[in-house]
Every structure is written in structure tokens, then in C-alpha cells.
């Protein structure tokens, strides 16, 4: 497939071959970056970051990636600083911003907003998260992190813990892992189970899926534990949130039952679902995940711009 001009909206739009191209390109760029410190592939290109919803890691990671490729960045970090506050439609915002840029990265609270942006734009659009729907670039950096740590993805037992209902990171990750020979453990309160259609699709694709609310019953089986916060902002009813708040905390007591080789991941930000005492253990790789976002997003930007 020709990558130049391609949109990155959903992990569902990716074949396994596409994923492997991104991961191998990221690996190459990470090596080049360590050798040279600064690359020039995107010199003369401009990235527009349109963040209608708060972000620290994703926005700064994309901006860092573009700068490290030699490009420039424009954009806004919250909708209140844009003309959307004056009533401008998303479509008009996109059509305007594309006049100033070569690629757009968008985060929006409404599901489907990134797809709409891609439909109206004539330049590539990358989804940095649309509501509780998809977060494809987070998924790619998660896969990259797993592969770097284990040298493979196939054959692993991977647990997804926490808010599996509203968590867009785990929706995208579960769908991508269906391309690999893995066993998935879905660990959540009953109220926050993975959407049924995703579980059914995983099983139809031959993935072995276990569902439980009891972390301790499976912690000893896992190679990877992917932890998510319970996302208060996604709940339609605060009472529903209060019922599940603080359902899990990964701490040293929990990890004492785990394999020595278990790796704990988290898309961040965290609240209290991973105790800070875990940070200094050999299990914790969530800050490595943060770094890995840079080469992965460099790869995506370079590919859709057609410069690498």
C-alpha cells in the first residue's frame, strides 16, 4: 500500500503487514536518532495539532516527533483557544487548517470526529483519540514497546486491566492483538467489561479470551499487564463511577504473585491504579512507553508525508 497521503484513523484500517511496516520503520528511526540526534526528513513540512480535549503525552510526543524529523508544528491545545468557541464547525476548522499545514493530528471528544476530519481534508489526518472509540497511535507504540521488551508479540499472555468499557486505548490494542498469537485476559469490574462486539470479534478471529474481575486469580499467568485508569470523564452518571472507583491497585503485594519477567504497562495518566512503589521495580515499563511514542509517531508522520 502507498503510505503517502494516507489517513490514520482506526487500527481496524491496518493490516498486520501495515503494523509491521510502522514498527520496523520506528526501529530504524530510533537507531538513526540515537546516532545523529536530529533528522531532516521532514524539513519544510508543517504538522498541525488540533486538540479539542486535554493531552500531555500524545500532543507533546507528536510535536517532539515532528521536530526530531526536522519539521515544524502549529496548532492549539484546547478548543477554547480556537474559532470553534465562536461556533465554527469541525469541517470548516479542518478545511482552514489544511491551508497552513501538510498533516493534521486531531484529538476530539466525539467518536467519529477524526473520520469526519479525514473525509473533508485533502491532506493526511491522524487520529490522536476520538472519545471512547479509538487511539491507533497509542496502540502502535504499545505494540512497539512489547516487541522491544520481549523480542516478539506472538506467544505472550497479555492482561488488560481496569476500564475496558470506555478505555479507547484497550479497544484499539485488543483489536490489533488479534493479528498475533496471544492469549488475552480481560480483567475489569462487571460494569466496565470490554464491549461485547469486540470480545466476539476477537473470538471469531481465533484469539483465546478470558474474562474475570479477579486480578489475583490470573496475575501469575501474565507476561504483560496493561493497566488503565477508570475514566471519570467518560461516565454518563457519577454514581456509576463511584461504584467502580478504586477497583484495582497494582502494588508490590500484587506483584509478589507475578512472574519475575512480568512487564507492567500503562498509557498514562495514572491516578491510583499503580502505586508509585512499582515505578522502581523491573516490572515497570510505562515511562519507556512514553519514550517509544516518539519513534513510532516519527514513523507514522514520515510515512504519511512520503518523506521516508
From Swiss-Prot:
Gene3D superfamilies given in the database record: Aspartate/ornithine carbamoyltransferase
Highest taxon, organism lineage: Archaea
Pfam family, one: OTCace_N
Keyword Transferase belongs to the record: yes
GO MF term list: amino acid binding; aspartate carbamoyltransferase activity
PANTHER family registered for this protein in UniProt: ASPARTATE CARBAMOYLTRANSFERASE, ORNITHINE CARBAMOYLTRANSFERASE, MITOCHONDRIAL
Protein name per the record: Aspartate carbamoyltransferase catalytic subunit
Organism: Pyrococcus furiosus (strain ATCC 43587 / DSM 3638 / JCM 8422 / Vc1)
Amino acid at each position: 500500500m502507498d503510505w503517502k497521503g494516507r489517513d490514520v484513523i482506526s487500527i481496524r484500517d491496518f493490516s498486520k503487514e501495515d503494523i509491521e511496516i510502522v514498527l520496523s520503520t520506528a526501529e530504524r528511526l530510533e537507531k538513526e536518532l540515537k546516532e545523529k540526534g536530529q533528522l531532516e526528513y521532514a524539513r519544510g513540512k508543517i504538522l498541525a495539532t488540533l486538540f479539542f480535549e486535554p493531552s500531555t503525552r500524545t500532543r507533546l510526543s507528536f510535536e517532539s516527533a515532528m521536530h526530531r524529523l526536522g519539521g515544524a508544528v502549529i496548532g492549539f491545545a484546547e478548543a477554547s483557544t480556537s474559532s470553534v468557541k465562536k461556533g465554527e464547525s469541525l469541517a470548516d476548522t479542518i478545511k482552514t487548517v489544511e491551508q497552513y499545514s501538510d498533516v493534521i493530528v486531531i484529538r476530539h471528544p466525539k467518536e467519529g470526529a477524526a473520520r469526519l476530519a479525514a473525509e473533508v481534508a485533502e491532506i493526511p489526518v491522524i487520529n490522536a483519540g476520538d472519545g471512547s472509540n479509538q487511539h491507533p497511535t497509542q496502540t502502535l507504540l504499545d505494540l512497539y514497546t512489547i516487541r522491544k521488551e520481549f523480542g516478539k508479540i506472538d506467544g505472550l499472555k497479555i492482561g488488560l486491566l481496569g476500564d475496558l468499557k470506555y478505555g479507547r486505548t484497550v479497544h484499539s490494542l485488543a483489536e490489533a492483538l488479534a493479528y498475533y498469537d496471544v492469549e488475552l485476559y480481560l480483567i475489569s469490574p462487571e460494569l466496565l467489561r470490554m464491549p461485547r462486539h469486540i470480545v466476539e470479534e476477537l473470538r471469531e478471529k481465533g484469539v483465546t479470551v478470558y474474562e474475570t474481575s479477579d486480578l489475583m486469580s490470573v496475575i501469575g499467568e501474565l507476561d504483560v499487564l496493561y493497566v488503565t485508569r477508570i475514566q471519570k470523564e467518560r461516565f454518563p452518571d457519577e454514581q456509576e463511577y463511584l461504584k467502580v472507583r478504586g477497583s484495582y491497585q497494582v502494588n508490590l503485594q500484587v506483584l509478589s504473585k507475578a512472574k519475575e519477567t512480568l512487564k507492567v504497562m500503562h498509557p498514562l495518566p495514572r491516578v491510583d491504579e499503580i502505586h508509585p512503589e512499582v515505578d522502581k521495580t523491573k516490572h515497570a515499563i510505562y515511562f519507556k512507553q512514553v519514550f517509544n511514542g516518539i519513534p513510532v509517531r516519527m514513523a507514522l508522520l514520515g510515512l504519511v508525508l512520503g518523506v521516508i
